[in-house]
């Protein structure tokens, strides 16, 4: 949040206690927060040659994912396009009534929904734990 202090402060003023900025956490605590979340937020990448592995962890939860894309070449976009509980919002579109209406509609549509892991695994078979382990073993 250090790079986004002003935006985070504005969001906190609007959302009050609904916005949590815990700072750095041990993995167990971060995992517990993720498990309690209704929607997971993915921050877009401006570099088209870097894929955040966290996204696949998010897919594995089966939870809705809100992705905030910074550019059209974000490498996560093809994967998010396959995920039925994803919404991608683009920075270039700004915060307009249309964008906020779209977000509001989506939040109501996905409320309480979660994909079973088996369904997510069918969407991304090459990224299941078994397939990744097979690939590691192939190279050892």
Question: What is each stretch, according to the model?
Answer:
Residues 26-37, 60:
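Short acidic alpha-helix that forms the nucleotide-activated donor recognition element
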Residues 34-49:
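Acidic donor-binding loop of glycosyltransferase active sites
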Residues 25-26, 72, 128:
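Short loop/turn segments at beta->alpha junctions
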Residues 31, 53-63, 77-78:
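Short alpha-helical segment that forms part of, or immediately flanks, the ligand-binding pocket
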Residues 39-41, 57, 64-70:
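Short hydrophobic beta-strand element within catalytic cores of glycosyltransferases
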